């Protein structure tokens, strides 16, 4: 989408004011104008009006933003306008995502050594070749769906796995710093659904607005074969016994939906061990809040990084316990996949050597190897078809095929829904299933994150991936006046664009000008972050509903996401962020900033989304029974994080894997 010559001139001047030329190229020197035009043409045509507003504000500002006044004065005026500030941030993201800028900040993706990239081939079946009937249809191919599909296929049943997303190559997911789930640039990633075909509605402070997959509030994870496990950080934490009984341990705060799980840690422990062995977890050390594992982890931890060594010594001085972060990443060769190459592009990216365990290189190949599993991609389950007695008899499928809408109903004996905590309730609601007591979609939660950032006098970053290496679990529970708590760990190796965003958001470096550029050169390798998720107390008013007026490209009502963060969650976030700062200061940080408090007035939804189809023992207060079976529908199961009554103060994927193993085990033996 081409700009006018006048707009190009304004944009080039703005880019060079924001990131000027010194001993290194300016933003305009590295193609800022072409970058913005490419974004408007290929990524976000809906941004054209905002770019026009920003450039018009530049042209008409009085006193002028562009002109002879001192640069500092002009920068201050420039950032006072929200549209100009937004455009400047986008320009900075483009600049620091370009390999041209990386030597300037001392960043490289291969600090841990070179590697030979590989691809995992999967047999994706054309839609025209689908059978009329399968014993089981599994909807979603992520952690829950992929795991369930393997167990069910290996039991001798025929399985169809339906995935809305495509199967992009590893190379296509391994290196783009702008277009990945961790980028803040707002550009669609290859793991996103079609931005224009899948809107959602986000309600904030009572005001509804239509949002697209790259936007905040949409609640994106990853729409691709393998789901979020293609590009996740792979932290493999267990929930601990207290996590399964939060209401009993702490009581129920006013306005919250805090409740106990219908199963205990002891019931899930064998499946935790099975998941750790089956999918491959590396790590070491003991979490003080759960007993020793019944089976030792199959791989030792990855060697600690330089930041981890500093944090370990600091924790010892503070009297805190630490452990190696458990990871679904091979530290050595395991099950035919190599050990980690220690690259600096891990979370948000596909693993170039397939050392990171994902459904695409574990469960799905195993399921397909039975000869009983069929995988179809770029196809959406639009409705579950019911017959007598609440039994589901089939699944309606829909897709775009050669530019036309394709529809097909596949018959089945059983259905497993594992489409994520936004799309799973949406499918049930669109199907009229499971909502007799208005429970489907309620208790939506994810993870509020706590943390702090520190700057050190000397360089502390060695850029050795994945980066996350050491954690303290001392504060998961047992904190006076706090409900639950969380885990704190060092952070994944950040990209230069992420580093810019972290430092500017914290107010530790200027956003623009020569001072900003020089600070990026000096501080990028002197920065360390300690972060972690907190245990949310949930709310019945945080929920997924069907929007009454907005539909997707197939005419189906989209998800309407509303709700808020409970005040207790903000108290816990502040408590844990203070602990993160203490840790950094003890490690030698000379300047620190804690994470800003999360905005309370919108629902918690994101990569760790959970809770929207919680399991329980009473149909009046849950969507499924303790075995994941939807109340009133004996052959419909849920097998993703939607089931979680609470979501722990740690990354939830290992619990999703373990619970999916448990549910599929029950299904195959029922």
Can you annotate each of these PLM segments?
Residues 324-328, 339-346, 382-385, 525-536, ...:
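A glycine-rich dinucleotide-binding beta-alpha-beta segment and adjacent secondary-structure elements
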Residues 185, 192-201, 211-215, 235, ...:
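Conserved redox-cofactor binding core of oxidoreductases
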Residues 151-154, 158-183, 370, 379, ...:
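Glycine-rich loop(s) and the adjacent beta-strand/alpha-helix scaffold that form part
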Residues 646-665:
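A conserved FAD-binding loop/helix module that cradles the flavin
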Residues 1, 204-228, 232-233, 237-238, ...:
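FAD cofactor-binding and catalytic pocket of flavoenzymes
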Residues 133-161:
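N-terminal Rossmann-like FAD-binding beta1-loop-alpha1 element of flavoenzymes
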Residues 166-191, 222-235:
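Conserved N-terminal glycine-rich FAD pyrophosphate-binding loop of Rossmann-like flavoproteins
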């Amino acid at each position: 989408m081409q700009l006018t010559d006048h707009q190009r001139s304004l944009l080039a001047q703005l880019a060079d004011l924001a990131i000027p030329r010194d001993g290194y190229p300016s933003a305009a020197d590295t193609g800022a104008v072409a970058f913005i035009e490419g974004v408007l043409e290929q990524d976000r045509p809906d941004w054209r009006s905002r770019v026009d507003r920003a450039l018009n504000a530049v042209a008409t500002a009085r006193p002028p933003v562009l002109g002879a006044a001192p640069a500092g004065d002009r920068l201050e005026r420039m950032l006072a306008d929200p549209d100009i500030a937004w455009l400047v941030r986008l320009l900075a993201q483009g600049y620091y995502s370009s390999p041209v800028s990386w030597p300037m900040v001392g960043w490289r993706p291969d600090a841990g050594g070179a590697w030979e990239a590989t691809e995992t081939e999967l047999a994706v079946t054309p839609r025209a070749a689908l059978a009329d009937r399968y014993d089981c249809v599994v909807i979603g191919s992520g952690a829950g769906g992929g795991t369930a599909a393997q167990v069910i296929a290996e039991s001798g049943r025929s399985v169809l796995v339906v995935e809305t997303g495509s199967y992009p190559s590893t190379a296509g997911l391994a290196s783009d710093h702008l277009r990945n789930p961790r980028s803040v640039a707002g550009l669609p990633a290859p793991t996103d659904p079609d931005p224009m075909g899948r809107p959602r509605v986000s309600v904030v402070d009572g005001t509804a607005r239509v949002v697209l997959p790259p936007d905040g509030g949409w609640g994106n994870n990853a729409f691709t074969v393998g789901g979020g496990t293609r590009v996740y950080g792979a932290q493999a934490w267990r929930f601990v016994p207290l996590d399964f009984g939060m209401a009993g341990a702490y009581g129920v705060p006013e306005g919250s939906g805090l409740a106990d799980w219908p199963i205990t840690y002891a019931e899930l422990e064998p499946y935790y061990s099975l998941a750790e062995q089956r999918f491959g977890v590396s790590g070491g050390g003991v979490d003080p809040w759960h007993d020793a594992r019944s089976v030792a982890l199959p791989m030792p931890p990855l060697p600690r990084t330089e930041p981890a060594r500093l944090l370990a010594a600091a924790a010892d001085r503070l009297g805190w316990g630490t452990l190696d972060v458990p990871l679904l990443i091979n530290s050595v060769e395991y099950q035919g996949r190599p050990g980690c190459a220690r690259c600096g592009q891990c979370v948000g990216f596909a693993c170039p050597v397939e050392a990171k365990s994902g459904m695409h290189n574990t469960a799905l190949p195993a399921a397909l190897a039975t000869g009983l599993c069929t995988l179809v991609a770029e196809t959406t389950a639009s409705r579950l078809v019911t017959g007598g007695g609440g039994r589901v008899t089939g699944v309606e499928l829909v897709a775009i095929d050669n530019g036309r809408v394709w529809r097909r109903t596949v018959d089945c004996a059983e259905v497993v829904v594992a489409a994520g905590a936004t799309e799973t309730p949406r499918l049930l609601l669109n199907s009229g299933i499971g909502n007799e007591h208005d429970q489907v979609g309620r208790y939506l939660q994810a993870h509020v994150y706590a943390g702090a950032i520190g700057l050190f006098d000397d360089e502390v970053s060695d850029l050795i991936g994945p980066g996350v290496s050491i954690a303290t679990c001392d504060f998961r529970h047992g904190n006076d006046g706090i409900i639950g708590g969380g885990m704190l760990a060092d952070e994944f190796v950040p990209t230069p664009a992420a580093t810019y965003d972290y430092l500017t958001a914290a107010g530790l470096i200027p956003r623009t000008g020569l001072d900003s550029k020089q600070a990026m050169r000096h501080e990028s390798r002197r920065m360390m972050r300690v972060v972690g998720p907190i245990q949310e107390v949930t709310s019945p008013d945080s929920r997924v509903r069907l929007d009454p007026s907005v539909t997707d490209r197939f005419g189906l009502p989209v998800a309407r996401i509303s709700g808020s963060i409970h005040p207790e969650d903000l108290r816990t976030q502040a408590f844990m962020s203070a602990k993160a700062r203490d840790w950094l200061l003890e490690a030698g940080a000379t300047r620190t900033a804690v994470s800003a408090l999360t905005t309370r007035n919108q629902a918690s939804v994101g990569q760790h989304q959970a809770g929207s189809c919680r399991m329980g023992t009473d149909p009046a207060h849950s969507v499924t029974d303790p075995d994941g079976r939807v109340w009133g529908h004996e052959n419909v199961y849920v097998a993703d994080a939607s089931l979680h009554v609470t979501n722990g103060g740690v990354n939830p994927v290992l619990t999703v894997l373990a619970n999916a193993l448990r549910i599929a085990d029950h299904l195959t033996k029922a």
